[in-house]
C-alpha cells in the first residue's frame, strides 16, 4: 500500500504521562527519535513541541492505523492521545516543483496539477 502524508495532533493523557515520556526521551538524539517511530508502514518526518498541551508530527504512513501501530510499538500510545488527519495537499519550500496545487476537495485528484 502506498504511503500518504498525515498531520497528527497529539496531547498527553496526563501530566504524569508527559513527565514520564519526556524523562524517557531526555537523552535521545533527533536521529534516535525518528528511528524509534519508523516502521514498514509509518514514519515520522517532522515533529513540533512547545510548552502547550498539544504537539504535532508529520507522518508518512499507509493509513492512520499504521501511525497507531508505530506509537504502540514505541510504547508511546498509552501516554498520548493522537488525532491523525490525512493531508492530500503536501508542499514544502524545501522541495518545490512548479506544479499546480492539489485541491483536496476535488473529487478526481488526477485532474489536479
Identify the meaning behind each predicted range.
Residues 1-44, 50-54, 65, 88-113:
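Short S/T/G/P-rich N-terminal loop/turn motif that feeds into the first structured element of a domain
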Residues 48-49, 60:
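Well-ordered beta-strand positions
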Residues 36-37, 60-93:
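An amphipathic, aromatic/His-enriched active-site/gating alpha helix that lines ligand/cofactor pockets
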Amino acid at each position: 500500500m502506498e504511503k500518504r502524508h498525515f498531520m497528527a495532533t497529539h496531547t498527553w493523557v496526563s501530566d504524569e504521562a508527559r513527565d514520564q515520556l519526556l524523562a524517557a526521551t531526555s537523552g535521545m538524539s533527533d536521529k534516535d527519535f525518528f528511528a524509534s517511530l519508523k516502521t514498514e508502514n509509518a514514519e515520522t518526518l517532522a515533529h513540533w513541541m512547545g510548552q502547550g498541551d498539544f504537539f504535532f508530527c508529520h507522518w508518512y504512513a499507509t493509513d492512520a492505523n499504521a501511525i497507531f501501530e508505530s506509537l504502540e510499538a514505541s510504547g508511546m500510545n498509552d501516554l498520548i492521545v493522537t488525532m491523525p488527519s490525512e493531508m492530500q495537499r503536501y508542499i514544502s519550500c524545501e522541495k518545490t516543483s512548479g506544479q499546480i496545487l492539489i485541491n483536496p476537495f476535488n473529487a478526481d485528484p488526477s485532474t489536479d496539477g
